[in-house]
C-alpha cells in the first residue's frame, strides 16, 4: 500500500471516521440524486413495482 504514510500525518482515530463519513455522504448523495431524477426508483422504493 503506497499511501500508508498518510497515517504518519493523520491519526487513524481521526482519519478513519472521516473517511467513512465521506463514503456515507457520497452514498447518500447518489441515492438522493437517483430518487429525485428518476420516476421508477421512488415507485420501486415504496413497494409499488
UniProtKB/Swiss-Prot annotation:
It is found in: Cell inner membrane. PROSITE patterns: ANTENNA_COMP_ALPHA. This is Light-harvesting protein B800/850/890 alpha-3 chain. Its main location: membrane. Belongs to the antenna complex alpha subunit family. The core complex is formed by different alpha and beta chains, binding bacteriochlorophyll molecules, and arranged most probably in tetrameric structures disposed around the reaction center. The non-pigmented gamma chains may constitute additional components. GO terms for cellular component: organelle inner membrane; plasma membrane; plasma membrane light-harvesting complex. InterPro entries: Antenna_a/b (IPR000066), Antenna_alpha (IPR018332), Antenna_alpha_CS (IPR002361), Light-harvesting_complex (IPR035889). It comes from Halorhodospira halophila (strain DSM 244 / SL1) (Ectothiorhodospira halophila (strain DSM 244 / SL1)). One of its GO terms (biological process) is photosynthesis, light reaction. GO terms for molecular function: bacteriochlorophyll binding; electron transporter, transferring electrons within the cyclic electron transport pathway of photosynthesis activity; metal ion binding. Signal peptide: none annotated. Residues 36-49 are periplasmic. It holds the Pfam family LHC. The keyword Mitochondrion does not apply. Antenna complexes are light-harvesting systems, which transfer the excitation energy to the reaction centers. Keywords: Antenna complex, Bacteriochlorophyll, Cell inner membrane, Cell membrane, Chlorophyll, Chromophore, Light-harvesting polypeptide, Magnesium, Membrane, Metal-binding, Transmembrane, Transmembrane helix. Residues 1-14 are cytoplasmic. A bacteriochlorophyll binds at residue 31. The chain crosses the membrane at residues 15-35. It is a single-pass type II membrane protein.
Amino acid at each position: 500500500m503506497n499511501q500508508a504514510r498518510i497515517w504518519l500525518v493523520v491519526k487513524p482515530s481521526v482519519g478513519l471516521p472521516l473517511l467513512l463519513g465521506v463514503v456515507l455522504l457520497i452514498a447518500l448523495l447518489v441515492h438522493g440524486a437517483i430518487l429525485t431524477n428518476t420516476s421508477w426508483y421512488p415507485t420501486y422504493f415504496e413497494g409499488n413495482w
